[in-house]
Amino acid sequence: MEPSFAHHEGADLPAWEEGHVRSRLIAGDAFGLRATVKTQSPLFCIHAAMPRGTRTVVPNHYSERAAHVSAGRVEIGGRIFGTGDMIVFKQGADAAVLALEPATVMLIGGEPLGERFIDWNFVSSSRERIEQAKADWSAGRMKLPDLDHEEFALYPVK
């Protein structure tokens, strides 16, 4: 698959409220809804805004699932987690999130994609693509973001 980018307005993504938790499906499918964002594999990504004392569940229809606490404190499985924590759930385990204070949580999951290779800021399922990306980066052939193009980090020599 070729690299790509697409922008989707938040208002165009499925949103719902249940038990005072406001959720938006950013990508994939969950709870009978499907986002318009094109994906390359089965997955879900949900943004959940949780008032204090509310509860939400992580969909369990994919083998790999996690929750990232973007803000606030939550309780999951009797343990307390805070801003910046990532919780990975065992396959098939029930996963409920309780907000101990106002919290924002990203719920993510999907199916394994196969082997991935990582080198510096490059991730691919192909070693050859990583080598090409390293060469393109070092030669200045990669376009930097419009609003973040003044600093250029050299590829680290190992």
Which residues make up each language-model segment?
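Jelly-roll (double-stranded beta-helix
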Residues: 1-158
